[in-house]
Amino acid sequence: MVSKQPRKQRKARYEAPLHMKQKYMAAPLSKALRGKYGRSANVIVGDTVIVMRGDHAGTKGKVEALSLKSGTIVVEGVSVSKVDGTEVPRPIYPSNVMITSLEMNDKHRDSILSRGR
């Protein structure tokens, strides 16, 4: 990014293509994982996370879905109730969660995480 202006920074993030927005989906790792994999990693479906900020702080659950368009993730157990009583998932920004265990079924992800460590 070239400009320092906050409005242009926000615009660049908003208008970025999806392969660039993937880089904004990183979350900090727990202390147990940090020694092996570094400070942060991209969140994928299946990772176990704990919510660190907001009304649902302390809630632990698996990542059920993620949206690159809005830059949010959906964690099981984090929901709000509508007026009619139905529960709807509450999207959370990845920076507000901490990854406690990684989904390692993907060999490509394992090579990415162990690269340069």
From Swiss-Prot:
InterPro entries listed in its UniProt record: KOW, Rib_uL2_dom2, Ribosomal_uL24_CS, Ribosomal_uL24_euk/arc, Ribosomal_uL24_KOW, Translation_prot_SH3-like_sf
Similarity section: Belongs to the universal ribosomal protein uL24 family.
GO cellular component: large ribosomal subunit
Pfam families, A to Z: KOW, Ribosomal_L26
Domain of life: Archaea
Gene3D superfamilies: 2.30.30.30
GO biological process: translation
CDD domains for the chain: KOW_RPL26
Alphabetically ordered keywords of this record: Ribonucleoprotein, Ribosomal protein, RNA-binding, rRNA-binding
Function: One of two assembly initiator proteins, it binds directly to the 5'-end of the 23S rRNA, where it nucleates assembly of the 50S subunit.
Name the record gives this protein: Large ribosomal subunit protein uL24
